[in-house]
Every structure is written in structure tokens, then in C-alpha cells.
Regions:
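Basic, amphipathic alpha-helical segments enriched in Lys/Arg and hydrophobic/aromatic residues
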Residues: 332-387
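An internal, acidic/charged active-site-proximal segment
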Residues: 160-281, 366-373, 403
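Short, conserved catalytic/metal-binding motifs centered on acidic residues
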Residues: 36, 85-99, 134, 196-204, ...
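Electropositive, glycine- and tryptophan-enriched low-complexity nucleic-acid-binding patches
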Residues: 47-51, 56, 114-192, 273-293
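Active-site-proximal, Lys/Arg-enriched surface segment
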Residues: 23, 56-154, 260, 264
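Short amphipathic alpha-helical "interface-anchor" segments enriched in bulky aromatics
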Residues: 95, 243, 302-334
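Gly/serine-rich nucleotide phosphate-binding loop at the start of the catalytic core
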Residues: 1-59
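Long, charge-rich low-complexity segments
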Residues: 64-76, 85-88, 190, 386-411
């Protein structure tokens, strides 16, 4: 936390530290501020923690900006140390589910849930919050670099009706939020880095593709079947290429088993794009009637190289799993949009700390995943608590005051 150089007052810094630390230590199913403060010895009233989010004069950007600079500097230092110059930038959004009865929290609304929807005819909507994340990977090191909360345009208009002009929110599309985060990244990335930006078909807009190419970055992403390559839609190309041989590409699945995919390669320009791209048509077997389409702007790469790079998007899904399941991202109980942003900022500070410990763990600790880091952090807290309690009991020659100090008693 000290390495972030947060520009907060001492009370603000203490509340951020308490909440972030308790988020990691807590094993509660729902990590509310009250439950987190019950873990802290001689903690102030939980309302102080809530007030630090609701009315304390700091913003989410006061945490986001230091995390961006810290993670960027750490990766640049590692690049010079390991002589690793290929940076993979993953972009994705995630939906944090809230109870259906949650109505009066400004950041909570119904969003289209593409993981539960069954095509356009059977859409599914989930009540919750949506955030967009940018993740960086350089060699064996990786960080959640930046994030943004997303609100639908209708929700922004509704909230602005009750706000003073200087407090009104501005609606931004998901692709616009993504472009803003990538623009900030461009200022931190050294010129010698070779950058690949990875995202799914939801972000494969022409504006985002053009933006990445203007920075000199390459893009590897999924495409929807209705995009036009040359004079045909992508959905028409499999039939047109039915006499062309498949290339067999082997990929390692999450369970480390090798799986073979049948791939055909195309080159051309998409509608309203001036640069040539490579498009892969992939299917798991000959009988599959719904192939997947992938785009790559680096024409020097083969299909066997492109698809493993696209697989590097998977860890961002793991990040989203940890912030939601283990760090309580969707467990906030604050009403205003700004307070919710602060909660998200504290959660991502906790995630950055865990990722830093994972990246810098000594070899003898055998730390291989964020779960190992969380387990180690909880063990260190438990050991410190036990040692302190034993030392105080020995000093006082009485265990009753020690129990009164270290055990929580509900009133």
C-alpha cells in the first residue's frame, strides 16, 4: 500500500487500508462494511467506514491513478530485467449480480446477461453492476491495470434528473470507456514494447480497431458472423471455402488437455477499415454448424500462433471471479454512484496487492495462484493475532482482558 503513494489524508488512508485488508481476510459469504469491521481489533464504528465511501472528499480516481502508475512501472522494470517486450492487453466486462429486490442503489440496474441469454430471441437480464477491466500481461507477470463502471444511457438520464448540473453523470458506451483506458495506457507503454490487444466480439468495433492500429498496436479478437470481409459476410465464407483443406490447430484447454480445432484462414479488409486483416474460421469438428471467427491484424502470425495468444484472455475471467467471489465486489450497500465507485476502487486495490505478492513471491513459498496468496495472507493474520494475544496474556498474567480485547461481542 505504501508503494502506491496514495494522496489521501491519514483517516482516509486508514479506512481504505482497513477495508482492503479485511476484504482479503474475511471468509464471510457477504462482505458488508459491518462484517468487515467486526474482524478488526478495536475498530471504529462501521458507520465511519461507510462515511468514508459516502461523504469523504476523495474519489475513485484517487486510487485508480496510483494503481495504474504502480503496475505500469512494475511491468516496465520487469521487462528490462527479463528482456521480455511483448505486452498482452486483455479487455473484458463483467456483470456482478445483486438481489432482484435491490432497487435504490444508483449503480445497480438490469443488464443484458450474454452468458445466460440464448440468442436474440431469448434474452436474459440480470440485476447488478457492470464494470469493464483492462488487464496487462508481460511474461509471467500480470496485473489488473484499470477499470470503469458502466451505466446504461437510460439510467444516466434518470439519475441526472435528480442531480445538480455540476454533479451530473456523462453516459459513455462500453467501447468509449475501453478506448479511454487504452489511451491512458498508451502514455505509459514504452515505444519498444510490442503490444497485442485482446477482446471478444462485443468490442470489435471499427473505432476501437482503428484506435489500436493508430497506436501501432496489434489486435486479436473474436468477430460476429455478420461482419463483412471483402464482398461476403463471414457467415457465407465457410460454404465458399468448402473445398479448401482445414488446418489443424492444437490448443491446451484449461484442464491442460490438448484439443484440436479445424481452421481456415482468410485475408482481406473489413467494411470501413482500410488495413488488411487475417480472419480465422474455426470449428471443433466437421459437423459443427456454428464456426467461430477471429481477427488478427498481425499478418506475420500463423493460425497456430494466433489462437494461443487469444487464449491469454482467460486470466481476466479469473480476475473477475476473484473480485466477485473472494473480494466482495458486488457486496456494497452504499446508495450513490460515487460511493459505489469508491468501493470498487478499494476492491481493485486489494486485487493489485494480491497480484503484486504473487508476482514477487520468493520461490521457496511455492505460491502459484491468487488463492495461494489469499491463504498465505490469512495465515499471517491469524499467526500475528495469536502471537499478540499470547504475549499480552503473558504480560498481564490474566487471559480475561485479552479475550475482551480480541473477541468480538455483539451489542
Amino acid at each position: 500500500m505504501c508503494g502506491l503513494h496514495l494522496r489521501l489524508t491519514k483517516p482516509q488512508w486508514q479506512h481504505v487500508l482497513r477495508i482492503a485488508d479485511a476484504l482479503i481476510v474475511s471468509e464471510a459469504r457477504h462482505k458488508t462494511i459491518a462484517s468487515l469491521y467486526r474482524l478488526i481489533v478495536e475498530a471504529p464504528d462501521p458507520s465511519n467506514g461507510a462515511d468514508s465511501l459516502r461523504i469523504s472528499p476523495w474519489t475513485a480516481e484517487d486510487l485508480r491513478a496510483p494503481v495504474r502508475h504502480f503496475t505500469g512501472a512494475d511491468l516496465v522494470a520487469y521487462a528490462h530485467e527479463a528482456q521480455e517486450w511483448t505486452l498482452y492487453v486483455s479487455l473484458d466486462d463483467s456483470l456482478g449480480e445483486k438481489d432482484k429486490g435491490t432497487r435504490h442503489l444508483e449503480a445497480v440496474e438490469y443488464h443484458h446477461d450474454h452468458t445466460k441469454s440464448q440468442g436474440k430471441k431469448n434474452p436474459y437480464y440480470t440485476n447488478g453492476t457492470v464494470h469493464i477491466e483492462v488487464r496487462l500481461q508481460l511474461g509471467v507477470r500480470s496485473y489488473a491495470y484499470d477499470w470503469r463502471l458502466y451505466l446504461r444511457e437510460k439510467t444516466v438520464r434518470c439519475l441526472n434528473r435528480r442531480r445538480a448540473p455540476e454533479q451530473r453523470l456523462r453516459f459513455r458506451k462500453k467501447t468509449s470507456l475501453a478506448r479511454d483506458m487504452l489511451a491512458g495506457l498508451q502514455q505509459l507503454v514504452p515505444a519498444e514494447f510490442r503490444v497485442y490487444v485482446l477482446f471478444d466480439s462485443w468490442y470489435a468495433s471499427n473505432r476501437l480497431l482503428k484506435f489500436c492500429r493508430r497506436q501501432g498496436w496489434h489486435v486479436i479478437c473474436a468477430l460476429k458472423s455478420n461482419r463483412t470481409l471483402g464482398e461476403k459476410k463471414l457467415s457465407q465464407w465457410p460454404h465458399a471455402l468448402r473445398h479448401q483443406r482445414y488446418q489443424r490447430v492444437q490448443l491446451s484447454a484449461a484442464d491442460q488437455r490438448l484439443r484440436t480445432y479445424l481452421v481456415r484462414t482468410l485475408r482481406g479488409t473489413l467494411t470501413q477499415l482500410s488495413f488488411e486483416v487475417c480472419v480465422l474460421i474455426s470449428r471443433p469438428h466437421h459437423r459443427d454448424k456454428h464456426p467461430k471467427y477471429f481477427l488478427c491484424t498481425d499478418l506475420a502470425l500463423s493460425a497456430q500462433q494466433i489462437l494461443p495468444i487469444y487464449q491469454k484472455r482467460w486470466p481476466i475471467e479469473v480476475d473477475n471471479f476473484y473480485v466477485k467471489q473472494h473480494l466482495g465486489l458486488a457486496d456494497f450497500r452504499v446508495q450513490s454512484y460515487e460511493a459505489t465507485e469508491k468501493w470498487f476502487a478499494v476492491v481493485f486495490v486489494a486485487l493489485a496487492f494480491l497480484q503484486w505478492r504473487l508476482n514477487h513471491a520468493p520461490a521457496e513459498e511455492r505460491v502459484r495462484s491468487l488463492a495461494d496468496v489469499v491463504r498465505q495472507h490469512r495465515y499471517e493474520h491469524a499467526r500475528t493475532l495469536l502471537e499478540t494475544a499470547c504475549q499480552e496474556a503473558a504480560r498481564l498474567a490474566d487471559y480475561v482482558p485479552v479475550l475482551q480485547r480480541f473477541l468480538y461481542h455483539s451489542t
